[in-house]
Amino acid sequence: MEFEAVIGLEVHVELLTETKIYCGCSTAFGSEPNKHVCPVCLGLPGSLPRLNKKVVEYAIKAGLALNCSINNKSRMDRKNYFYADCPKNYQITQQEIPICREGFIEIRNHLGEKKRIGIERIHMEEDAGKLIHTDEGTLIDYNRAGIPLIEIVSKPDIRTSKEAVSYLEDLRNILKFIGVSDCKMEQGSLRCDCNISIRPKHNLKLGVKTEIKNMNSFKALEKAIQYEYKRQSDLIESGEKVRQETRRWNDAKNVTEVMRSKEYANDYRYFPEGDLTAINISDNYIDNIRKTIPELPDKKIDRFVEEFKISRKEIEILILNMEIGDFFENAAKLSGDPKSVSNWITGDISRLAKETGIPLNNLNFTERDLAELIEFINCGVISNNIGKKVIEEMFYKGKSPRQIIHEKGFVQNSSKEKILKVVKEVMEENPKSIEDYKKGKKKAVKFMIGMVMKKTKGNANPMLVNKLVEEEIGKY
């Protein structure tokens, strides 16, 4: 029997606010344990929460970017459960009236075709503390307690592990692009739970779903779905039943493991949060937030592909964040050579950024500087190899290409007489290479060209060097 998976994702996203959702404690990551805490986020008796307005703004901004409707009236609810990392023994979240509902994003499948994935709801909530297990016992860091989250719940429109990864990647890109989260999975600011069931293909009846947790990377999400699909398929084909339960992905063993039987909403005894008033959002407030949303990644990609005639794959790398996309666009227009701009950004500039840890959106030079460098290369003032040396100086010292070329004496030598003199010297010094050429060894020509470039310290015009070497060696 052939089965298909029915998959929905619940994505928890930490918002880039300076303070927590219900108090004024800092949200700074990586501080010493329990430094950013107060009576409110520790759940001490008598402490009262106050909703952070920036959290509401960012939740609405995310909802609009994800094509959601925004509820003009919303409220917070208590979700009651007892666990060590939840100091109040309840979480302030949204159950009945979430801030956003009925949205969608469009992903691309393996054929490059668009597929719409529905978003059921987006709601605001607080994060829990962090448990740290040691040989002596379990410690609790409450710095994370009260960090503002939005939970984005997709509809069960996803059918494969590849689609799930594509959805999560697109979601991450949008949220980073609009500046509401840094979406760093390695720091836990983007976390994903997966609900998956299987059913016979072309059968509309849903199967019993399993929730999978502890997937800390896109690869883990893909592998967990593939494993769970096979596990459930094997159970059904052997006549056994799939149980509704929560499972944990074990990255070391590449398996899912049982955590607990699946809870239902009434297990949490939700009821309205009495310490916070209802949230009233005007249409004017929503419209003002809408105006702050930039051109989103998918539309920008389509426009760049059409306008600059370079591949979608290259463009996807160039717009990983808004600043890089804007840098590329401005440099492409200034230089009139978008392909070269793309090559420099995705090549040498990205390499230098990775080696130094300097982010691409914090470069020492401007779009005009890169356009000027490309113009010098295209006009033959310097070679592409010299351009690589210039870009390093630009990257580290922030000088303009013109200044670097002048200071270093990098101007390309295009004098036929001077280059021909070096070519003849190289041939006199390497008679064996000439003999190799006579025997049909084409590598001898490349060797000669390399030696000429070495002698001229890379300043010779490479096209002229090629031409003169081939002409001279052909005389032997």
UniProtKB/Swiss-Prot annotation:
Q: Which domain of life is it from?
A: Bacteria
UniProtKB keywords: ATP-binding, Ligase, Nucleotide-binding, Protein biosynthesis
Q: Reaction(s) catalyzed by this protein?
A: L-glutamyl-tRNA(Gln) + L-glutamine + ATP + H2O = L-glutaminyl-tRNA(Gln) + L-glutamate + ADP + phosphate + H(+); L-aspartyl-tRNA(Asn) + L-glutamine + ATP + H2O = L-asparaginyl-tRNA(Asn) + L-glutamate + ADP + phosphate + 2 H(+)
Pfam families named among the record's database cross-references: GatB_N, GatB_Yqey
**Leading EC class:** ligase
Q: Name one GO molecular function term.
A: ATP binding
Q: What does this protein do?
A: Allows the formation of correctly charged Asn-tRNA(Asn) or Gln-tRNA(Gln) through the transamidation of misacylated Asp-tRNA(Asn) or Glu-tRNA(Gln) in organisms which lack either or both of asparaginyl-tRNA or glutaminyl-tRNA synthetases. The reaction takes place in the presence of glutamine and ATP through an activated phospho-Asp-tRNA(Asn) or phospho-Glu-tRNA(Gln).
Q: Which family does it belong to?
A: Belongs to the GatB/GatE family. GatB subfamily.
Record's PANTHER family?
A: GLUTAMYL-TRNA GLN AMIDOTRANSFERASE SUBUNIT B MITOCHONDRIAL AND PROKARYOTIC PET112-RELATED (PTHR11659), GLUTAMYL-TRNA(GLN) AMIDOTRANSFERASE SUBUNIT B, MITOCHONDRIAL (PTHR11659:SF0)
Q: What is this protein called?
A: Aspartyl/glutamyl-tRNA(Asn/Gln) amidotransferase subunit B
Instruction: Give the originating organism.
Output: Clostridium kluyveri (strain ATCC 8527 / DSM 555 / NBRC 12016 / NCIMB 10680 / K1)
Question: What phylogenetic lineage does the species belong to?
Answer: Bacteria, Bacillati, Bacillota, Clostridia, Eubacteriales
User: Which gene holds the coding sequence for this protein?
Assistant: gatB
